[in-house]
């Protein structure tokens, strides 16, 4: 909406006359597990995140339907909370509507600026219908009156990993997005995607399922945990550098409690994830990249491989991936990730949004 037409009295653009001052830059990632928004100064952004879920309940006095979202919904209404983007994208009209309602509630509760330029970090998934539904959610959203743009999640996540500015937009490198619902790999050449690859077989959610199964096996069937608890075990205890067994207590059906200790379940699951991710990258993605863009393949592997997504938060996973991939392809490689990988995509999107505002591209 960049319009430089001036009037006779003030010299203000049509956009400024309509909206006022410069729009606020926002970076947004609406993920399958978490939604993250970065705003304010890109050098030190304010980051807000919540679980991508909602629940409804009827007011006990008026019968009016109310909506709650995020951790509050997951904790208070575990029986009917809806994670509407479990597969990474909305699957039908119902989940699209739920996602719209969730984002409206989230934006309102957190005071997100409607007079804004918004950059969304979106997944690289071969699902045109799902991407169209995601676009509908974005376009109908409560923010981004000046401009809405979208960039690949792995590119956005690489931005804070490769410098303080937007160096990632000028570099040639490989990014691996280790998300809840997909493992994505892509080469970037000055922001252009090359040989994008995605699989739903190697995911953070699959790690959660394995942890739940392995906990049951390790406790000889005495403990059954849900996927939310398995995810919490992973996030709180998985550590390639300094893992320590941990204990938990459950309430038994007949009364009383049972205390148990987990030795291997969590690390077995994340160890298998790294092996599977390395195998897919080394034996599927990289050969395809080399076949189509051999010079880009060579140049990209001379630069650090950027790991993004929630699984990148596990301490030591970057060096573990680096070592195993190097052994698999018989070549020295370097891997890196941003600080706080779980929010990196939103923070990178925010930097892009701020640059668009600075350039007047709205």
UniProtKB/Swiss-Prot annotation:
Acidic residues compositional bias, start-end: 1-10
Residue spans crossing the bilayer: none
Entries under InterPro entries matching the protein: ATPase_NBD (IPR043129)
Gene3D superfamilies (UniProt xref): 3.30.420.40
Disruption phenotype: In standard phosphate media, deletion of the gene does not affect the rod shape of the cell, growth rates or motility. In low-phosphate media, when the chromosomal copy number becomes limiting, cells lacking this gene show defects in cell shape, perturbed DNA distributions, reduced growth rate and reduced viability.
Keywords: Cytoplasm
SUPFAM superfamilies linked: Actin-like ATPase domain (SSF53067)
GO cellular component, one term: cytoplasm
Principal localisation: cytoplasm
Residue ranges of the region described as Disordered: 1-28
Disulfide-bonded cysteines: none
Chain's role: Actin homolog which might be involved in partitioning DNA between daughter cells when chromosomal copy number is low.
Complex and partners: Forms dynamically unstable filaments. Monomers are added at the growing filament end. In vitro, salactin polymerizes in the presence of ATP and AMP-PNP but not in the presence of ADP, GTP, ATPgammaS or buffer alone.
Protein name (database record): Salactin
Species whose genome carries this gene: Halobacterium salinarum (strain ATCC 700922 / JCM 11081 / NRC-1)
Biological classification of the source: Archaea, Methanobacteriati, Methanobacteriota, Stenosarchaea group, Halobacteria
């Amino acid at each position: 909406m960049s319009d430089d037409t001036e009037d006779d009295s003030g010299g203000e653009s049509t956009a400024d006359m309509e909206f006022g001052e410069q729009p606020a830059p926002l970076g947004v990632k609406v993920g399958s597990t978490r939604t993250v928004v970065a705003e304010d100064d890109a050098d030190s952004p304010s980051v807000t995140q919540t679980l991508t879920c909602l629940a409804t309940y009827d007011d006990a006095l008026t019968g009016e339907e109310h909506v709650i979202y995020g951790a509050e919904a997951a904790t208070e209404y575990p029986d009917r909370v809806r994670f509407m983007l479990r597969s990474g994208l909305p699957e039908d009209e119902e989940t699209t509507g739920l996602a719209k309602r969730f984002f409206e509630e989230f934006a309102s509760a957190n005071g997100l600026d409607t007079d804004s330029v918004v950059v969304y970090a979106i997944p690289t998934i071969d699902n045109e219908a799902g991407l169209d539904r995601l676009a509908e959610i974005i376009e109908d959203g409560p923010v981004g009156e000046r401009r809405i743009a979208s960039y690949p999640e792995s590119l956005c996540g690489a931005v804070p990993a490769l410098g303080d500015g937007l160096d990632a937009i000028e570099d040639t490198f490989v990014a691996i997005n280790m998300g809840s619902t997909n493992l994505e790999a892509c080469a970037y050449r000055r922001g252009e995607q090359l040989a994008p690859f995605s699989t739903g077989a190697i995911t953070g959610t699959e790690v959660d399922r394995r942890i739940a199964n392995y906990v049951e096996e390790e406790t000889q069937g005495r403990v059954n945990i849900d996927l939310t608890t398995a995810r919490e075990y992973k996030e709180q205890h998985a550590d390639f550098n300094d893992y320590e067994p941990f204990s938990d207590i459950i309430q038994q059906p007949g009364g009383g409690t049972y205390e148990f200790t987990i030795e291997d379940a969590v690390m077995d699951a994340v160890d298998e994830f790294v092996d599977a991710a390395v195998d897919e990258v080394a034996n599927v993605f990289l050969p395809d990249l080399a076949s189509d863009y051999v010079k880009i393949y060579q140049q990209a592997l001379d630069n650090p491989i950027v790991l993004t997504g929630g699984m990148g938060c596990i301490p030591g996973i970057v060096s573990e991936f680096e070592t195993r991939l190097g052994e698999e392809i018989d070549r020295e490689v370097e891997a890196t990730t941003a600080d706080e990988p779980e929010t990196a995509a939103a923070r990178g999107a925010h930097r892009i949004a701020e640059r668009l505002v600075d350039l007047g591209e709205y």
